[in-house]
């Protein structure tokens, strides 16, 4: 039990990825034919959508942004589908199942970044950018260096996320469906490539929307059945859970998963600013027609996600009552069959029988596909748009850029499958924490200051951004998660599991210092360009909308 909790708590936003949701010990389950049939129905339906989307992808705008014609409501659902992962569902429910109230604190932690995105980023990002957040960061700064840094930040985050997601997918499918791990990884990789290769952002968007609807429906039904069991009384829910849980009343006490205030603060900052620096999330704001729709996207997405995380809290307590106290779901040693992360899946069986169990298992797989499709598209756009079309071959035609993007999708897919197989038995939970730390320490400071600080220069952004990225990586390696748990050293050089507090500080200080001391003519010119950028970011004047976007 302690190992499962440690692995879950040792990642910055463990629920941002399927990998860490199943980082504890898992046991392969018997082949679940109902789940497989339901999943095949989902795959056939989404491949049909991909075929439909492929007929409508005629240009670079269509491929990267679905023509800019996604509505705020649709994009809000898609963002929720991109952000709510299998770990959000299984991992958070498992945390509530084992630790009670602390699970709610973690689930709410994933929402704290969205007000930042709503009030500080969404509108200006849409008004200044076209396809990637590097468009915004390089708006008035030197194109080459800034795009290289932004693309590197994006690709590192995408790669770490993708590896962890593929390993998580293989283990999760082995656990839920009884399929072989290698078959599961190849299946996810091939489907991911097909969605992105042929359907681009339009297919990816609708896969994410469908997945979000299915996940919200499944979680709502489970929460409804749990509340029905206790007469729709939260008092009864908590009382019954405390009565059967081994920890008793202690499950209602907070503070059991974070050791000290610095770790808590660092974790919170990583969650908050990491979310605002995830390339596959930021890319979604270019799929809407204008800044107003971008704001609506965040509003709807936050509502859907907030509702979902409240449901996971109810599901977790429901699992304590209906699963934890039921010997049918325990093995001979008294442990939950399949591990604690199966709590929500067992609850699906308890409240809806085998048919609903199959549905929830299929939804968990669909969840993984939606997330990896978004990641792959973000990685491909960083290579084709930021590096190829704007650094290495300026003036490349749309056709050339799209060809590079699709080649990148194939390469990313093959690499993801190979690394997913190679990392099968490795502890990859730290990759999620590192991805969020880099997003918070490199991507976020550059995006924020490029839009809001008139004195930012290319020198400051480059040196500060690289310092933030390197600091996050080094501190993560020297911390307890990698240095002790993975490399086997006796004591960590850096005592905290979460580096975000320190790496973010280094990034902001570095950007400020090297920009403030930049007295070059180029730096002065970049400062003068801020006023024109500010006007466009506020008014949207000059922004192309809709299909022309």
From Swiss-Prot:
<keyword id="KW-0739">Sodium transport</keyword>
<dbReference type="Pfam" id="PF00474">
    <property type="entry name" value="SSF"/>
</dbReference>
<dbReference type="GO" id="GO:0005886">
    <property type="term" value="C:plasma membrane"/>
</dbReference>
<feature type="transmembrane region" description="Helical">
    <location>
        <begin position="493"/>
        <end position="513"/>
    </location>
</feature>
<keyword id="KW-0915">Sodium</keyword>
<dbReference type="InterPro" id="IPR001734">
    <property type="entry name" value="Na/solute_symporter"/>
</dbReference>
<feature type="transmembrane region" description="Helical">
    <location>
        <begin position="148"/>
        <end position="168"/>
    </location>
</feature>
<protein>
    <recommendedName>
        <fullName>Cation/acetate symporter ActP</fullName>
    </recommendedName>
</protein>
<dbReference type="InterPro" id="IPR038377">
    <property type="entry name" value="Na/Glc_symporter_sf"/>
</dbReference>
<dbReference type="GO" id="GO:0006814">
    <property type="term" value="P:sodium ion transport"/>
</dbReference>
<feature type="transmembrane region" description="Helical">
    <location>
        <begin position="33"/>
        <end position="53"/>
    </location>
</feature>
<feature type="transmembrane region" description="Helical">
    <location>
        <begin position="464"/>
        <end position="484"/>
    </location>
</feature>
<dbReference type="GO" id="GO:0043879">
    <property type="term" value="F:glycolate transmembrane transporter activity"/>
</dbReference>
<feature type="transmembrane region" description="Helical">
    <location>
        <begin position="103"/>
        <end position="123"/>
    </location>
</feature>
<comment type="function">
    <text>Transports acetate.</text>
</comment>
<keyword id="KW-0769">Symport</keyword>
<dbReference type="InterPro" id="IPR050277">
    <property type="entry name" value="Sodium:Solute_Symporter"/>
</dbReference>
<keyword id="KW-1003">Cell membrane</keyword>
<feature type="transmembrane region" description="Helical">
    <location>
        <begin position="262"/>
        <end position="282"/>
    </location>
</feature>
<feature type="transmembrane region" description="Helical">
    <location>
        <begin position="404"/>
        <end position="424"/>
    </location>
</feature>
<comment type="similarity">
    <text>Belongs to the sodium:solute symporter (SSF) (TC 2.A.21) family.</text>
</comment>
<feature type="transmembrane region" description="Helical">
    <location>
        <begin position="183"/>
        <end position="203"/>
    </location>
</feature>
<dbReference type="GO" id="GO:0006847">
    <property type="term" value="P:plasma membrane acetate transport"/>
</dbReference>
<feature type="transmembrane region" description="Helical">
    <location>
        <begin position="428"/>
        <end position="448"/>
    </location>
</feature>
<keyword id="KW-1133">Transmembrane helix</keyword>
<feature type="transmembrane region" description="Helical">
    <location>
        <begin position="355"/>
        <end position="375"/>
    </location>
</feature>
<keyword id="KW-0997">Cell inner membrane</keyword>
<keyword id="KW-0813">Transport</keyword>
<feature type="transmembrane region" description="Helical">
    <location>
        <begin position="77"/>
        <end position="97"/>
    </location>
</feature>
<dbReference type="InterPro" id="IPR014083">
    <property type="entry name" value="Cation/Ac_symporter_ActP"/>
</dbReference>
<keyword id="KW-0812">Transmembrane</keyword>
<dbReference type="InterPro" id="IPR018212">
    <property type="entry name" value="Na/solute_symporter_CS"/>
</dbReference>
<dbReference type="GO" id="GO:0015123">
    <property type="term" value="F:acetate transmembrane transporter activity"/>
</dbReference>
<feature type="transmembrane region" description="Helical">
    <location>
        <begin position="303"/>
        <end position="323"/>
    </location>
</feature>
<feature type="transmembrane region" description="Helical">
    <location>
        <begin position="206"/>
        <end position="226"/>
    </location>
</feature>
<keyword id="KW-0406">Ion transport</keyword>
<dbReference type="GO" id="GO:0015293">
    <property type="term" value="F:symporter activity"/>
</dbReference>
<keyword id="KW-0472">Membrane</keyword>
